[in-house]
UniProtKB/Swiss-Prot annotation:
Residues 80-132 are annotated as: Homodimerization. The gene is DAZL. Homodimer and heterodimer. Forms a heterodimer with DAZ. Interacts with BOLL, DAZAP1 and DAZAP2. Interacts with PUM2 Multiple DAZL RRMs can bind to a single RNA containing multiple GUU triplets. This is Deleted in azoospermia-like. It is found in: Cytoplasm; Nucleus. It comes from Macaca fascicularis (Crab-eating macaque). Coiled coil: none annotated. The DAZ domain mediates the interaction with DAZAP1 and DAZAP2. The lineage of its organism: Eukaryota, Metazoa, Chordata, Craniata, Vertebrata.
Amino acid sequence: MSAANPETPNSTISREASTQSSSAAASQGYVLPEGKIMPNTVFVGGIDVRMDETEIRSFFARYGSVKEVKIITDRTGVSKGYGFVSFFNDVDVQKIVESQINFHGKKLKLGPAIRKQNLCAYHVQPRPLVFNHPPPPQFQNVWTNPNTETYMQPPTTMNPITQYVQAYPTYPNSPVQVITGYQLPVYNYQMPPQWPVGEQRSYVVPPAYSAVNYHCNEVDPGAEVVPNECSVHEATPPSGNGPQKKSVDRSIQTVVSCLFNPENRLRNTVVTQDDYFKDKRVHHFRRSRAMLKSV
């Protein structure tokens, strides 16, 4: 006893319609794509840009009650030249496809409407835009020296080629270490606090003494001094601006006349620095008698 699976009338009609549509499409010179044939729907190609859905609906109304007319357009709304016409009731799609239809003097390309299978929808997830912000300014303390602080600042964006790094010392009385830019040698500038803030800057140089030997003999007042060997230390004038500034040209041999009192005259003795300045305050130098002929 064999069991037979009876076929429904709808499946038989659908298979026959598909076969007829395939043969009709092959007779018109094009091959149908693989997919599911949409019932009661006709593919219409060769649509002129001047045609609208209302005209197409009124034209295909002769074949049955038109359900929908869809003209495919691009993103700008311009027709791509083809569309679909669907009917409410069962219509003879094969009869419509085999008919030669000219609309506005242009032959329409008709065929069964086929929905393609295995359609892959490609969804691309948009990537978020990431903006690289410049790093925030960094302030670091160098503990190698308790009075030394390091200040770092990122380069400004005003000029993309040249980068400037500026240091901001907050303590003017403390040494400041300046770091200049990226991948550059580090220069340490040590500024010792020699004066408080707001005070006039002055440089104090300790006086230096050089030994000068003079030859002096006993002379009467008013006579020229004959040099005799004696050791006198001459003070070098300070480099700062003072009320009394004297310069000594060491390239010229200078002999200083010494006029001593008879009570304090010394013979062939060494005159110390204190005695020299004491005698200098007592006796006045006279340039007319002080300059001697150099030997």
